[in-house]
From Swiss-Prot:
GO molecular function: rRNA binding; structural constituent of ribosome
GO cellular component: cytoplasm; ribonucleoprotein complex; ribosome
Record-linked HAMAP family: Ribosomal_bL21
InterPro entries: bL21-like, bL21-like_sf, Ribosomal_bL21, Ribosomal_bL21_CS
Keyword tRNA-binding: no
PROSITE patterns linked to this entry: RIBOSOMAL_L21
One family name in Pfam for this protein: Ribosomal_L21p
Originating organism: Prochlorococcus marinus (strain NATL1A)
Keywords: Ribonucleoprotein, Ribosomal protein, RNA-binding, rRNA-binding
Name of the protein: Large ribosomal subunit protein bL21
Gene Ontology process terms (BP): translation
Family: Belongs to the bacterial ribosomal protein bL21 family.
Name of the gene encoding the protein in the UniProt record: rplU
Function, as annotated: This protein binds to 23S rRNA in the presence of protein L20.
Subunit structure of this chain's protein: Part of the 50S ribosomal subunit. Contacts protein L20.
Length: 139
């Protein structure tokens, strides 16, 4: 039987880079070149947004923890598409009575791609983007 020698995978510091950011009222663990689904934000497709509420940043060498945010840390994301999440069915029934109610809901989402995670004052200051879903009222 032949021995299979496993070659060690060469680790790139880019692979270990991640940031924990606050967006849409939640905290997200973001890595470069991956896409994530946020609550619907008011941005057009192909817009590049900058998130500055970085709680923690690891660039592969050292870990920076914010109090509450890391100073001069930015995450640039690109809006890929606006979509809707899976349908959630809520069914309420009272036993021995003729009371039944069935509701469905699909959450409005924005799919974004993380382009870069950076720290330092060499990046230009941009306006903060509010990434919260707006409440839709029906008549």
């Amino acid at each position: 039987m032949a021995d299979k020698k496993s070659s060690p995978k060469k680790e790139n510091p880019q692979d270990k880079t991640y940031a924990i950011v606050e967006a849409s009222g939640k905290q997200f663990w973001l890595q470069p070149n991956r896409y994530y689904d946020f609550d619907r934000c008011q941005a057009e497709v192909d817009d590049v947004l900058t998130l500055e509420n970085v709680l923690l940043l690891n660039d592969g060498k050292d870990l920076k923890l914010g109090k509450p945010y890391v100073k001069d840390a930015k995450v640039e994301i690109k809006v890929l598409e606006h979509r809707r999440g899976p349908k959630i069915i809520v069914y309420k029934m009272r036993p021995k009575k003729k009371t039944r109610r069935k509701n469905g809901h699909r959450q409005e989402l924005t799919r974004v791609l993380v382009q870069s995670i950076s720290i330092g004052s060499n990046t230009k200051k941009s306006k903060a983007v509010k990434t919260t879903a707006s409440k839709v009222e029906s008549d």
